[in-house]
From Swiss-Prot:
This is Cardiolipin synthase A. It catalyses: 2 a 1,2-diacyl-sn-glycero-3-phospho-(1'-sn-glycerol) = a cardiolipin + glycerol. It comes from Yersinia pseudotuberculosis serotype IB (strain PB1/+). The lineage of its organism: Bacteria, Pseudomonadati, Pseudomonadota, Gammaproteobacteria, Enterobacterales. Belongs to the phospholipase D family. Cardiolipin synthase subfamily. ClsA sub-subfamily. Keywords: Cell inner membrane, Cell membrane, Lipid biosynthesis, Lipid metabolism, Membrane, Phospholipid biosynthesis, Phospholipid metabolism, Repeat, Transferase, Transmembrane, Transmembrane helix.
């Protein structure tokens, strides 16, 4: 009997180390970034079983077999649609400003289409303005309304949006609503899903959270886009979830959330429409390709319209596109670079690009919230401040609430506005969307908003920063080590 237990013990030890070795080899063979690989290896060797379970659940980007098959199956029809869209020559920009040209070239070659011109673009910087404008557009809708949001939380003005959406469905407008399962969990526990479905709205819970499927699909892969499409002509996107900040996370201790959204009219709605169509098909298996732009309803001349490129990321879309776009934008800066983000945990490449821009004389400013709803991100982001300050980057800490806006402005001409945070999850993992706008008029509008953020912020002083307590430094480095996983 003793021999039997000895054999079992040795087999258990052998199996344990074989499992460790197998996962280690898998991490090394994935050719991931060195900091990310080192972080996972440390977790696995310090907390072996927990680390292995965590890696198999969250360490690799896998969409799940069914969704992956749908993503693969939809590409031929999407490619044909893009080919047909290219025949609408009148909507595409043939030239861009000097600072924007490299980024637009990257997008055209990786995504297959140029930026579209002739769009009317409005920057909305308050929740009231955004939700009231959205209600007006929904009330005027005649054919279709499509929405995707990470968070939809009932309360306040959001309920007016829900009521107007249900009224639109009752009068015959085809309404589709795609909401992330994790972000919108309060919505799916409320009476609204049943009410909306009874009104005729197609409500879909995207990327359902299910502990029994954690090894079949990565659970922290989230649908983080915020898109509204109305009649294939009016569109919204930006940083704002479908929440009223007066009713959202009031107990978080960070103040009201501050966001920005872009409202668009014109052919850019078509390119946003194909992104939505891909998301809808991946989640439901149903194909809803948008119609091509109607030349009869494009009243804006090239001279007065905005040129916009849409960048989408996530499984099924060009890999590392968002990351490459940000790097290209930063390296294009010659005079000024202003970035706003609630979560600043950049890749090494992006950090070095920002520091290099400052070191070659570009006026670089980063605006982040002083208080953050994520304790881990709050400490991890501070681990980058010393290197940024030493390079000459100005860091502003926003004190008027949780600054949730995501924007980049390069030389007053090239703007990036959307859902992308400057962290690993947005850069490498989630379904995200970003608008690239080549227009000095819109750049001036964005600069005015960023100046307002700066006026409500405190500039981080380098000398005071260097005198922070030792325990702060230790905590920062601890969370910095796990930054590739945040």
């Amino acid at each position: 009997m003793t021999t039997f237990y000895t054999v079992i013990s040795w087999l258990s030890v052998f199996g344990y180390w074989l499992l460790i070795a197998g996962v280690t080899l898998r991490i090394l063979m994935k050719r991931r970034a060195v900091p990310s690989a080192m972080a996972w290896l440390l977790i696995i060797y310090i907390l072996p079983l927990v680390g292995i379970i965590a890696y198999l659940s969250f360490g690799e980007l896998h969409l799940g077999k069914r969704r992956a098959e749908r993503a693969k199956a939809m590409w031929p029809s999407t490619a044909r649609w893009l080919s047909e869209l290219k025949e609408c020559q009148h909507i595409f920009a043939n030239s861009n400003s000097e600072v924007a040209t490299p980024l637009f070239q990257l997008c055209e070659r990786r995504q297959g289409i140029n930026g579209v011109k002739g769009n009317q673009l409005q920057l909305l910087t308050t929740t009231d303005d955004t939700l009231k404008a959205l209600v007006r557009d929904i009330e005027l809708a005649r054919h279709n309304i499509e929405m995707v949001f990470y968070i939809w939380q009932p309360g306040g003005l959001v309920d007016q949006v829900a009521e107007s959406l249900m009224a639109a469905a009752r009068r015959g407008v085809h309404c589709r609503l795609l909401l992330d399962s994790a972000g919108s969990k309060q919505f799916f526990r409320s009476p609204y899903p049943a009410m909306m479905r009874n009104a005729g709205i197609e409500v879909v819970e995207a990327l359902k959270v299910n502990v029994f499927r954690m090894f079949l699909r990565r659970m922290d892969l989230r649908q983080h886009r915020k898109i509204v499409l109305i009649d294939n002509y009016v569109a919204y996107t930006g940083s704002m979830n479908m929440v009223d900040p007066r009713f959202f996370k009031q107990d978080a201790g960070v103040g009201q959330w501050i966001d920005m959204m872009a409202r668009m009219e014109g052919p850019v709605a078509t390119t946003l429409g194909i992104v939505y169509a891909c998301d809808w098909e991946i989640e439901t298996g149903k194909r809803i390709l948008p119609p091509p732009p109607d030349a009869n309803i494009m009243p804006f001349e090239e001279e007065t319209g905005h040129t916009i490129q849409v960048i989408a990321s996530g499984p099924g879309f060009p890999e590392e596109m968002i990351h490459q776009a940000l790097l290209t934008a930063v390296y294009a800066a010659r005079e000024q670079l202003i970035m706003t983000t609630p979560y600043f945990v950049p890749s090494d490449d992006l950090l070095h690009a920002i520091c290099t821009a400052a070191q070659r004389g570009v006026d670089v400013s980063i605006i982040v919230p002083r208080e953050n709803d994520s304790m881990m991100v709050r400490w991890a982001s501070r681990a980058f401040f010393t290197e940024l300050l030493n390079a000459g980057v100005k860091i502003y800490q926003f004190e008027g609430g949780l600054l949730h806006s995501k924007s980049v402005l390069v030389d007053g001409q090239l703007s990036l506005v959307g859902t992308v945070n400057l962290d690993m999850r947005s850069l490498w993992l989630n379904f995200e969307i970003t608008l690239v706008i080549d227009d000095d008029g819109f750049g001036a509008d964005l600069a005015q908003v960023q100046d307002d953020y700066i006026a409500r912020s405190a500039l981080l002083d380098g000398e005071r920063w260097n005198k922070r307590p030792l325990w702060h430094r230790v905590t920062e480095r601890l969370f910095y080590f796990f930054s590739p996983l945040l």
